[in-house]
Each structure stands twice: as C-alpha cells, then as structure tokens.
C-alpha cells in the first residue's frame, strides 16, 4: 500500500493517466511438493493500479476455486484468462482504444 500510495502522491493529477500492471510469468501449484515448497504452476495472478479504474479497490476475477475437482490437471489453479487478454483489454479501456485493434497490435499471434 505504501509503495502505490507514494507513487500516486508523487504523480499528483497524472495518476489518473497512469496504468501500472503487475503480473508474473508463471503460477504455483496449489499442493506442496516433497520438499515443502511448490512447483511452477499454470494460472497466476495479475494486478492493475491506476487513478482511473472503473472498479478501483475491488477484486475482479473469475475465481475457479481450489477444491480438487476445480483444479487444472488436479494440481494447479485453473486459468480463466490469458495474460494477452488481460494486458490488451486493460490498455484499451484505460486509453479508450479499440480492444480488437489493441490486442492485434500488441499480440498478433493471439488476436
């Protein structure tokens, strides 16, 4: 909270023109492995920070659940959205761009 608050305060009125995306390139398994850690998994988490988010302060997600029957291949969180969709849709909404053209420009193999 302090990091984002400091960034917001430093940017002042430009905070509403700023979009910060945080994402990882891989998730983690739900279950612990033999050494008490977790292995690389399938689904991950991503966050947006901005002064202009329509749902600011809320968690917006399609939560698949963590019951064994809800896991991907019985061990990973089930993906509900590709990163390419998350990133291109966030940029398109924030900067009032056409989402189809934005996705095609940023991720031509995904469009």
Question: Model regions: which residues?
Answer:
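Feature marks hydrolase-like catalytic cores characterized by long aromatic- and Gly/Pro-rich stretches
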Residues: 1-111
């Amino acid at each position: 909270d302090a990091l984002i608050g400091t960034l917001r305060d430093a940017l002042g009125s430009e905070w509403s023109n700023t979009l910060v995306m945080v994402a990882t390139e891989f998730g983690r398994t739900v279950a612990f492995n033999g050494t008490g850690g977790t292995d690389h998994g399938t689904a991950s988490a991503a966050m947006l920070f901005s002064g202009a988010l329509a749902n600011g302060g809320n968690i917006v997600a399609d939560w698949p659940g963590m019951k064994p029957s809800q896991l991907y291949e019985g061990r990973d969180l089930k993906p509900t959205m590709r990163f390419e969709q998350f990133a291109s849709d966030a940029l398109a909404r924030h900067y009032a761009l056409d989402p189809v053209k934005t996705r095609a420009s940023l991720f031509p193999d995904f469009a």
